[in-house]
Amino acid sequence: MKKRVLTYLALALLLSCTRIEVQDWEPQSLVAYNVVSSTAAQTKATTAFPTTSTFMSSAYQLNSGQSWDSNYALSTWKFGPEEVKYMGTYWSTDDKHFWEDGKTLTFFSYAPASLSSLGLTISEEGVSVNAWDVTDDSKKDKLILVADIAKDKVKNESFAGFTGVPTHFRHKLCKVSIRLAKSTFSGADDIYVTKLSIGSYFTKADFKKGGTDAESWTNLQKSVSETVLYEDAKGKLLSDAFWVLDNVMIPQTLTADSYLTISYKSVKSGVTNDEGPVTLYFMRDFRSGIWAIGTHVTYTLKVGAGMFPIQFEASADAWIPSGTTGIEIL
């Protein structure tokens, strides 16, 4: 009996020393986010946003009865930009924000959150950045994802297993891939690429009104006469499998002068011949001169020797996220 009493006393002492956190808000009143990634504006396909990544978001407030399209100039700042992260069962900010009766919220968001240090901003006009240069060391191969504007929201919404503000991210740059392989009818034993370059395009521009129907890349700057993508005197040996060079580019319409140039060596029966340089123009030869927002443009070359040494074609598709997380966050 004495042992049992001591046990009860110990338990009571433990409970008296234990701090019990009381949640003083209802889960449905918290502003949360329902996050997915869309491949591009041209498709409805979506993939889950990786829970290990974070993004930035801002919200603007209007009175009920006012719509964002008609009254956005009357909106007031509610919060942000703040970092949104996965909290175990939901997406939200460290500082909690709540839905208010008689008010609506409109949201702008971009990912990844690290872009905040590279000049991305949010205003009632949307997401923007000035003078984004894809050749700058700090920005090269970086991706910009912007969510569609979430207008006139009064509560969390359920979709794809989460509840919150619909936050659908899309790529806002353009992915340009160049694929090279040895032609089936090569006319040579081996093909070695010694140089590959592109030129006459812009690498710097301003992005405005991101997340809205009016978003665009403007003020194109820094025209590049030549960018060497690969150069090696020994050369890159081509095979039947494609060798792929991926590049992140400013969306733009190319000019008639925009080009791709390839130099290579062909080897036949131990005899080496220098081939090229061969210049192909994106508009004239590939018939593909538009690097649109959120697209993946692919230029394919099958290289050989002889009368018809290079077969080439181009294609443009939605920029589809890849990798185990379903989205490329660099």
Question: Can you describe what each PLM-predicted range is?
Answer:
Residues 13-16:
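C-terminal motif of bacterial Sec signal peptides marking the signal peptidase cleavage site
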